């Protein structure tokens, strides 16, 4: 899926969590006794009834995380962590930072975080700072239930280079994420997702191994 398609899914899901429309997950917003919700389609899958792929998962058909994976991760309390899987505070830039193909890489840059404040930089220049408090009115139902708002920055004119997000709690940087504009394909990078598991060659463990096409700096070349 392209950046724009992934962002469309993120916006749809966060609107559902915020209590808008028919797909309000069993009246989650309206019912104070509803403890939470789960996503049925964790991964993209091949439909049995038709020859097509359903792109409704938060990971792709190979279990590689999509943007919405990190959107849902931002709903986790920053005090909660599980060694080997995730640490409490998180921040993620939902962009490939590539103007040529995606209009959403140029102006509105979305950042997911479960922290109090987010700063976004382009090539070391501050684009803006947003706080959880400032964003709450747009996502009140989510925040009141312990979730997090989306942080959306108007980045203005596009520049190749690096986007960097900093997440802050009590004025201190607790998490960062950077995305650099990809260059030409240069190498294959092997990414082994152990998720804290020490694999044993006894036939019981299955560990996904991904081969990513990257440029000379290690940035993912998303369209290769």
Question: Residues of each region from the PLM?
Answer:
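Extended substrate-binding grooves/exosites of carbohydrate-active enzymes
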Residues: 1-172
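Short beta-turn/strand-loop junction motif enriched in small, turn-promoting residues
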Residues: 22, 98, 197, 216-218
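Short, solvent-exposed loop/linker segments at the N-terminal edge
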Residues: 98-105, 196-207
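Beta-strand-rich structural segments
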Residues: 111-113, 204-222
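Generic structural detector for well-ordered beta-strands
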Residues: 152-156, 178-180, 191
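Edge beta-strands of extracellular beta-sandwich domains
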Residues: 171-183
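Low-complexity, acidic Ser/Thr/Pro/Gly-rich terminal tails and inter-domain linkers that flank the onset
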Residues: 182-202
């Amino acid at each position: 899926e392209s950046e724009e398609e992934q962002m469309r899914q993120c916006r749809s899901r966060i609107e559902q969590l915020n209590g808008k429309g028919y797909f309000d997950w069993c009246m989650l917003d309206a019912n104070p006794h509803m403890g939470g919700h789960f996503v049925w389609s964790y991964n993209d899958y091949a439909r049995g009834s038709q020859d097509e792929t359903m792109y409704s998962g938060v990971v792709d058909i190979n279990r590689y995380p999509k943007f919405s994976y990190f959107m849902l991760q931002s709903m986790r309390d920053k005090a909660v962590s599980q060694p080997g899987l995730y640490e409490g505070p998180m921040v993620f830039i939902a962009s490939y930072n590539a103007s040529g193909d995606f209009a959403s890489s140029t102006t509105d840059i979305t950042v997911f975080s479960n922290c109090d404040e987010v700063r976004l930089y382009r090539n070391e220049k501050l684009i803006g700072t947003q706080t959880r408090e400032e964003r709450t009115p747009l996502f009140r139902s989510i925040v009141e239930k312990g979730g997090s708002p989306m942080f959306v920055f108007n980045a203005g004119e596009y520049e190749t280079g690096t986007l960097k997000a900093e997440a802050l709690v009590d004025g201190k940087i607790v998490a960062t994420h950077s995305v650099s504009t990809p260059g030409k394909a240069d190498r294959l990078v092997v990414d082994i997702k152990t998720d804290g598991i020490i694999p044993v060659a006894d036939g019981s463990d299955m560990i996904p191994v991904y081969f990513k096409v990257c440029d000379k700096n290690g940035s993912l070349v998303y369209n290769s």
